[in-house]
């Protein structure tokens, strides 16, 4: 067992970079929040990925949150390389609110990021973006929480993905000292 697999399942995202004819979409699991104030997120991308070069060139990217309905597109985005894969995907690229990089209409949410830092760690570059705007489907979020009926995707390994169950677990009451 490879040690990194011990950290799965991880949420799956689509990273959009570039614009116009240079737009690309890739699947990524290695995405996380790195700061609340200012709100920043990070994504690890290998230098051989086409998206890596577009983020370096345009200094911005969009993190799109796919649902189970988008699994085919997630798979294409994660297994094909270069912009020609967009012809196979059934997504609609729409203008973002604050960036030149487009967002994905079918996504549960789109988080628009302006690149503020990048560092190489081993075989990946860690791109940190400050969130400058966002959009989301109203049916996918309620009361400031994800609506699990929207079927957010998580990647377990290889071709296996799961969604989150509707049952919410809460810890038993813990009394503070």
Descriptions of predicted regions:
Residues 1-177:
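Basic, polyanion-binding surface patches
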């Amino acid at each position: 067992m490879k040690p990194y697999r011990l950290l799965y399942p991880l949420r799956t995202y689509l990273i959009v970079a570039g614009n116009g004819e240079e737009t690309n979409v890739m699947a990524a699991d290695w995405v996380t929040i790195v700061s609340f104030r200012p709100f920043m997120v990070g994504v690890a991308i290998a230098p051989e990925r086409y998206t890596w070069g577009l983020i370096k060139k345009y200094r911005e990217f969009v993190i799109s949150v796919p649902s189970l309905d988008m699994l085919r597109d997630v798979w294409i985005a994660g297994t094909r390389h270069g912009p020609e894969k967009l012809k196979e995907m059934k997504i609609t690229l729409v203008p973002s609110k604050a960036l030149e990089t487009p967002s994905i209409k079918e996504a549960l949410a789109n988080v628009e990021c302006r690149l503020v830092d990048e560092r190489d760690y081993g075989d990946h570059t860690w791109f940190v973006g400050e969130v400058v705007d966002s959009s989301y489907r109203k049916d996918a979020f309620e009361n400031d929480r994800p609506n699990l009926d929207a079927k957010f995707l998580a990647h377990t390994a290889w071709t296996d993905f799961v969604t989150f169950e509707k049952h919410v677990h809460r810890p038993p009451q813990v009394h503070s000292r």
